[in-house]
Amino acid sequence: MNIRKTSNLNKCLNLIVLILLLFNIIFLTSCNENGNTPLTPDYDYSLFPEEYEGLIKNKQVYFTSIGQSTDIDTFKILVLDNFVSFNYIFDKDITINEIQENSIVFVFVGCSVKALGESGTSIEDELNRTNNLINQLKTKNITMIGLHTGGQARRGSTSNQFIEKIFSNSSLNIFVESGNFDNMLTTLSVENNIKCYQIITVTELNNTIKLLNGVKE
C-alpha cells in the first residue's frame, strides 16, 4: 500500500515537472517571436563582410541623409572630399524620383530637430520621404546601404524612428560602435537578416568605401 502511494506520488511530481518545462519552452519561444528578448549572435561585427567587396564598382552612387543631421557633412569633409575619386551624387534631400534604377544609395540616418526646423522640413515630411524611398527599392532595383555615424548623440526616440526604417530595409548596415551602446543597431540587422559592419570612427569609412569599390590596400 505504501509502495503504491509512493509510486503515484512520484508520477504526479514527474508530471508537474514536465508541465513546467513545457510551459517554460512555450514562454521563451513566444518572447523571441514577439521580439521582446532580441538576441545578437556572438559575431565579430568589426569584420567587413567579404561578399560586399566591389558592390558599388561601376555603379551610379548617391549619398543622402535621413533626419537632416550633420553627420553626412562630416563624412563629406573627412572622406568624400579627400579620398573618393569615383563619380557620385551628393544630395541630402534627394527623393526616390531622382534616383536612377540599378544604383547604390548610401543613407546616413540620424535626426536633428534643429536642422529639420531650419530646413523647414517636418518630421512627418522626412518620414514620408523615407517611406517613399523604401517602397521603391525593389521596383527600381536600388541597393540601399544604411549608415549611422553620429554615435550615441544621434540616438533617441526621434532618431530611432528613422533608424528602424532604414536599418530594417537596407542591404548592408554600417555604424560606429558608440551608437550601438544598447545593441539596437546589430539587433535590427540580425532580425532582418541584414549584414552589418561596425567601425570605431567615421574616418574608417575611407577604407570601407574603397572595399565597397573593390579596392584593397
Regions found by a protein language model. Give the residues of each.
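N-terminal secretory signal peptides that target proteins for export/translocation
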Residues: M1-N10
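C-terminal motif of bacterial Sec signal peptides marking the signal peptidase cleavage site
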Residues: F27-S30
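Bacterial signal peptide processing site
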Residues: N32-N34
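Short, charged N-terminal beta->alpha structural module
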Residues: I56-N82
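A short, well-structured beta->alpha microelement
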Residues: V79-E101
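A short, gly/pro- and small-residue-rich
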Residues: L116-K140, S189-C196
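Ser/Thr/Gly-rich flexible loops in soluble cytosolic domains mediating phosphotransfer, phosphorylation
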Residues: E126-N160, E204-N213
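Structural recognition of alpha->loop->beta junctions
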Residues: G156-T187
